[in-house]
């Protein structure tokens, strides 16, 4: 199929349906396809609108009741991928262009025996629940984190329950 993009002036990503694909683990990062209301498929829309960028491995959730689009992802990179993707991505709802990417939702540092510190992820993305147009909750493998939509920041974890 012919590859088109919003920069061509004829794709409005607010007028159709997204299909979020976890993809084939061990081979590549997640992809996002788009079906226009006219029945035309736009394949790999995220990569097409953001050359050189990808979502991470096993995208779990996409939300856009209010502008912008939000993608929540389990891990940053599939073992077979060449690009480290984002774990949480904020995109323009009409153009799909990245506004902000987060390589991690939450981190800690690990120090090896030589004293070298390494930043590691402590929270794999699972879901997103909006509270209103200003705030939402990111569900992770390590608690619930607050996303500030006005400042595009991820805050600390809420107390874990259960």
Where are the predicted features?
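Short beta-strand/turn micro-motifs composed of small residues
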Residues: 21, 125, 140
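Intrinsically disordered, low-complexity linker/loop segments enriched in Gly/Pro
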Residues: 135-162
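Repeated scaffold domains used in trafficking and secretory/extracellular systems
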Residues: 4-6, 53-63, 107-133, 160-162
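Beta-propeller fold detector
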Residues: 41-52, 98-106, 154-162
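Acidic/polar, low-complexity intrinsically disordered N-terminal segments immediately downstream
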Residues: 1-93, 97
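Surface-exposed, polar helix/loop patches in the mature regions of secreted/periplasmic/lumenal proteins
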Residues: 73-127
């Amino acid at each position: 199929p012919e590859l088109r993009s919003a920069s061509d002036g004829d794709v409005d990503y607010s007028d159709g349906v997204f299909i979020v694909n976890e993809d084939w683990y061990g081979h590549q990062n997640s992809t996002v396809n788009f079906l226009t209301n006219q029945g035309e498929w736009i394949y790999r829309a995220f990569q097409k609108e953001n050359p050189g960028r990808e979502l991470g491995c096993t995208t779990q959730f996409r939300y856009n009741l209010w502008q912008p689009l939000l993608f929540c992802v389990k891990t940053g990179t599939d073992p077979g991928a060449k690009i480290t993707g984002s774990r949480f991505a904020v995109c323009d709802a009409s153009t799909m262009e990245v506004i902000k990417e987060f390589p991690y939702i939450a981190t800690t540092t690990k120090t090896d025996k030589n004293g070298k510190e390494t930043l590691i992820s402590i929270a794999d993305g699972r879901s997103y629940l909006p509270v209103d147009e200003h705030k939402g909750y990111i569900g992770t493998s390590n608690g619930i984190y607050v996303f500030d939509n006005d400042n595009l920041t991820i805050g600390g974890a809420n107390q874990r329950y259960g």
